[in-house]
Amino acid sequence: VMADESVCTPYDAMRLAREQASHVFSLKVAKHGGLLRTRKVAAIALAADSGWYGGTRLETSIGSAASAHVFATLGGQHYNCELFGPQLLVDDIVTVRMAVRDFEPQLPDGPGLGIEIDLQQLARFARALAGSQPQHFDM
């Protein structure tokens, strides 16, 4: 059994670990609130002898590169990952998308996250430059 939406915070991970409710934790950097919180959730999973699966939130190459880097730092039982978000996008804001070979994402190895922002693409996608204003919707 893999915990996905039921494990967003380290508190959720502790609860699931105590209850032995899952054999695998789905890790998603955006879902957990960043790289460090993802590592905290992973540490709890590993301490509970659970495995982990690297998931995605259909982010750009920036998010996928960040996820790839944090997943590369984790040990323990690994149940693959899915970092296909950039492959679903028509355009992206990086000069070169993260490579995938033999169904495996290739960890970028340049400075920082190993990616380079395409400033022309960034300007193209910026709402303020396109003439529209950000809107807030109450839910």
Language model: regions and residue ranges:
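C-terminal extensions of enzymes
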Residues: L88-M139
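Shared catalytic-loop signature of beta/alpha-barrel
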Residues: M2, V7-E104, P108
